[in-house]
């Protein structure tokens, strides 16, 4: 995402705003180049390349001969649907994660969609420089933020990634607020880096949270719901914020985005005491459906 922002800034700087369509065409062509790699290189599971299933792998990639049988494999299709329903659709933690993901994506997409406009119209930067700055915040801040968030989840919060997400959302919202209020270009750059740094922690970990709470048997469904909520936020950032900025200026947009950040922090705080994963719940559900 950061590279696309920099690319679009370069295109507009050199070809003018009348060539806006290049910002859609060029990234689309680049994306098409990746299609053959995915089609021919992406595999469904390790067995397709001669490796044993992940569940049967032990330390040092050694096969576990006495691996326990899969408790879900003996369920009927109707019973399996009940498991999915209980672990995902009737699981309040999945919906809390989804709502919180929606909120943090509001701030993320506000920066990605309108960050260049903020920097050029409010901070007075050239479009190419603004694009490069945004790319730097995404690549540097985002990458480091994801790595640190994952490390903290394991080392500090005993794999309870939702707790890491809470702190990340709080500090991402605060950084975005400070970016809005500062007039210094240098401080604006610093606060944007911090915004990306803290945003990409939840972006990476919310999928992990959903997988842990839904368990491996419903990972796809749980992540699907969380992902839909995340990208549904583009309706707010793209349509609503665009109309709001045109009518009342950018100062009318920032408070709304910040309010969503606060709401996201409150939402994820509701599952502070939640376990690291849903396998204990799964065992209870299996006993009920069998």
Residue ranges and their predicted role:
Residues 1-8, 138-142, 227-237:
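Glycine-rich segments within core transmembrane alpha-helices of 12-TM secondary carriers
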Residues 1-45:
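Helix-loop-helix hairpin linking two adjacent transmembrane segments in secondary transporters
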Residues 29-60, 267-272:
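C-terminal membrane-cytosol helix-exit motif in multi-pass small-molecule transporters
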Residues 50-96, 286-290:
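Juxtamembrane intracellular "pre-TM" segments in multi-pass secondary transporters
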Residues 89-147, 203, 207, 237-238:
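Extracytoplasmic gate region of multi-pass secondary transporters
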Residues 154-169:
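Cytoplasmic membrane-interface "Motif A"-like loop-to-helix N-cap segments
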Residues 170-183:
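C-terminal ends and interior cores of transmembrane alpha-helices
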Residues 216-247:
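A late C-terminal transmembrane helix in Major Facilitator Superfamily
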